[in-house]
Amino acid sequence: MKRSKLLSLLLVGALSASLVACGSASGSTSGDTANSASTETTDSASSETTDSTGGENSKKPLVWFNRQPSNSSTGELDMTALNFNENTYYVGFDANQGAELQGQMVLDYIKANAATIDRNGDGVIGYILAIGDIGHNDSIARTRGVRSALGTGVDASGVIDASPVGTNADGSATVVQDATLDIDGKTYTIRELASQEMKNSAGATWDAATAGNAIGTWSASFGDDIDVVVSNNDGMGMSMFNAWAKDNKVPTFGYDANSDAVAAIAEGYGGTISQHADVQAYLTLRVLRNALDGVDVNTGIGTADAAGNVLEEGVDYRYSAEERSY
């Protein structure tokens, strides 16, 4: 019987000097593009690439990495793509775990600094959110993670609505809701003032320039109502930070632990989450190499290879077999 395996890496959020999580200063994998590696080039993380003809390609090893194949509307995993053949694997980070860490990072910062970040003293902590790609499962998870942690999420068919709110100056939007947070005897309202997908005129998503333009528009509309800036990744986050948030001392939170974002924490960037791209790269190549060599997929991962290479399960990575693979 066939089993399609899932390798998900554990995310580790390290405390920075500003009491928020940040990652290492090494390169990052942002989850901004769909990727796969195989002996045949594959361009999209969807079942549309699946060779259902039973031809020669259907027997070749296939390793999805960085972005799990998923439904572009709901973020639901594409089990057809994940079960392409017995040598199909996914290597990447747990999108939901990372999203939860980012949301908790923002919440912890607000709790620790509510009195100082409420810039106009109105008792409303207003945040704006840069969404990378409304059809990308990582982007969906990160949007849900922030809204879940802050209490601004609204249930939509059993999951938190990840739709952009547009603008929400008065808290009347239906895709989000106002939340309340009691801190040191004072009750604050948490409100998502605005959010949008950062797509440029050419159709490119996760676009930093679009985010930089958006923060200009939002700051003109909301002014001192903006207390926190949140982004699905550091590329967009740093664009908004450099364009406006840095000069106005508004904490900005991203994702990926890009080197410039980590360095910017010393200048007021709120925090970021590391995906440990070095481990992801090793696992992607290792799983593919093992499949091509016809050796046990765990070689050099959970069990040492001939050179002694081995990772520690539960620390460096986590392994989980797909429940539908039996």
Residue ranges and their predicted role:
Residues M1-L10:
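Bacterial N-terminal signal peptides that target proteins for export
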Residues S18-A21:
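C-terminal motif of bacterial Sec signal peptides marking the signal peptidase cleavage site
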Residues G23-S26:
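Bacterial signal peptide processing site
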Residues A34-A37, A45, D51-A112, T116, ...:
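Acidic/His-rich segments in extracytoplasmic proteins that coordinate ligands and/or metal ions
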Residues A37, D51-S58, L62, V146, ...:
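Hydrophobic alpha-helical
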Residues N83, Y89-D122, A141, A208-G212, ...:
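Hydrophobic alpha-helical segments within soluble ligand-binding/sensing domains
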Residues G98-Q102, N137-R191, T210, A214, ...:
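Short, solvent-exposed amphipathic alpha-helices that sit
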Residues V124-I125, A130-I131, D138, L150, ...:
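Hinge/cleft segment of the Venus flytrap/periplasmic-binding protein
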